[in-house]
Amino acid sequence: MTAIALTIAGSDSSGGAGVEADLKTFSALGVYGAVVTTALTAQNTRGVFGIHDVPADFVAAQINAVFTDLDVGAVKIGMLANASTIDVVAAALDRYRPRNVVLDPVMIASSGERLLREDAIGRL
């Protein structure tokens, strides 16, 4: 049986980070990857030009869709963007109790732009 991992993170339009990079890693390791997208970013190797947060209720809907259908063995958490999303993800982890969780919160892009709202830092 193929192992299943879920990435909960932002989407990087250049493919160098976020869910796109996580899926590449999962695939290279022979793991089936599922995705919950928390934010859409307009970025490239030079910088971040825009961030659109996915509404927290839609993040919750994505998480529920994955966990009610797939046997997720591991969850990797990246960009959460805001306090509402952090709360939704925390509640889902408490509800579904995945066996393995990696918390790798992305707070600042490699180009220096803030990816986590300052008022959400304490929620982590």
Question: Where on the chain are the PLM-derived regions?
Answer:
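Conserved beta-alpha-beta core of the PfkB/ribokinase-like small-molecule kinase fold
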Residues: 74-77, 81-124
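Small-residue (G/A/S/T)-rich helix-start motifs and N-terminal tracts that mark the onset
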Residues: 1-74
